[in-house]
Amino acid sequence: MALRDERVTLAHGGGGKAMRDLIEEVFTSVFQPPGMEDQARLTEAALAEPGARLAFTTDSYVVTPVEFPGGDIGKIAVCGTVNDLAVGGARPLWLSAAFILEEGTEVALLRRIVATMAREAEAAGVRIVTGDTKVVGRGACDGVFVTTSGVGVIPPGREMAAGRVRPGDVAIVNGVLGDHGATILAARGDLALTSDIESDCAALGHLMADVIAAAPGIRAARDLTRGGLASALNEIAQTAGCGLVIEETALPLRPEVVGLCEILGLDPLYLANEGRLVVFVPEAEAAAALAAMRARPEGAGACVVGRAVAEHAGQVRMRTAFGGARIVDMLVGEQLPRIC
């Protein structure tokens, strides 16, 4: 029988007919894995190559609003988990998806989110193979929360880690920074702001595969989510035990994002991104890595932003446009809550 409810009710999480109708019509009819059940049955063929290793990651998403220019919570959930696997050197393969739904949530909204997830998973080359749904009373959560876990495979011999970064290595980002954080801030409507900026949310698995093929000596990569570029670079500097220097004039920032940050007293280096990463490669492979990024739409704006140095170990410093220098520290506190 067709699902007739326009809004999610507590019965949709009760384990009975209403729950079955919701799952069959909204979830499994769209995700369509053969025999989708609570326990995914995965093939071992991906691990047949001697020396291959499994990669596993999990993340929860509570972004508000759940729909925004350039994406929605479903897109972030798929892309974010794919990206977590990809920057670790893995080939993403399988995802799980768990939903916590607030009583009263529009079923039409849920359908849109699920359709986005299916579309993004197909584009990223991954399958959503299992999931779960819970419904809570009004006010117990805020609309829709999503948790995704991902499994991928790291090919034999591939070693990517922050501790491998060495002085002289080049830092490359794949495009303009801060668009996602700025988009969420404007979309909330708390301030009288109008903007044409859209979230940069994108799956980066294919881009990472191309970069690794072009620059096999790649040292490390990080996706630039909460805490932005600044926090990711600090984590790498502290783990690698070397210093990092970035050039203010090289940072790819839209004037609209810079202007928004100036008005609100924010630093764009700490704004979240959902489709941006930084990779560190030996200088001899930097040109090849750049070319590989720029050949893909999600890397068209790739550029070099800095490099690793032997001095000031564990610190990130920025050469300013005026010829000075300042320390770029880890984010303290929270610039913008619930951005992913």
UniProtKB/Swiss-Prot annotation:
Protein name from the UniProt record: Carbamoyl dehydratase HypE
Organism (species): Rhodobacter capsulatus (Rhodopseudomonas capsulata)
Protein family per UniProt: Belongs to the HypE family.
Keyword Lipoprotein attributed: no
PANTHER family: CARBAMOYL DEHYDRATASE HYPE (PTHR30303:SF0), HYDROGENASE ISOENZYMES FORMATION PROTEIN HYPE (PTHR30303)
List of residues that carry S-cyanocysteine: C340
Chemical reaction(s) catalysed: C-terminal S-carboxamide-L-cysteinyl-[HypE protein] + ATP = C-terminal S-cyanate-L-cysteinyl-[HypE protein] + ADP + phosphate + H(+)
Domain of life assignment: Bacteria
